[in-house]
Amino acid sequence: MKVNLGCGNKLLKGYINLDKFEYYNCDVTHDLEKFPYPFKSNSIQEVLLSHVLEHIGQQPDTFINIMKELYRICKNQSLIIINVPHPRHEDFLSDPTHVRPITILGLSLFDKKLNEEWQKVGAANTPLGLIHNINFKRIID
């Protein structure tokens, strides 16, 4: 199963299209800051988050719960595709609905192997993957 989370007006064939607003007439209406998500554990093979993550999870606990839910619903070896604006680009800075910059390093905090490597060398990076039992691996920049 493939899901297009925060789809807005970009409804995709072959995906379950989910958005917070009924206005978009998507398959599922659900707020991504409300938990749990309406999917069974280990049921999703692909997640698309296109220009979504920067709009949700302003509070650290909420953002971590979003990551926990993504991890819960994904099968082993699932693919999560994330598109976000660069945090220093005018597109990010000028939109008042952008509440959190999303960076490669920030997402890497949820990679257990990197967490362990950082701990061995005394890096100051917070090992969120180890703390919250989330293990995402970055495969493409």
Labelled PLM ranges:
Residues K2-H86:
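Conserved SAM-binding loop
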Residues G57-N65, E69-Y71, K75, L79-D141:
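S-adenosyl-L-methionine-dependent methyltransferase catalytic module, highlighting the catalytic core
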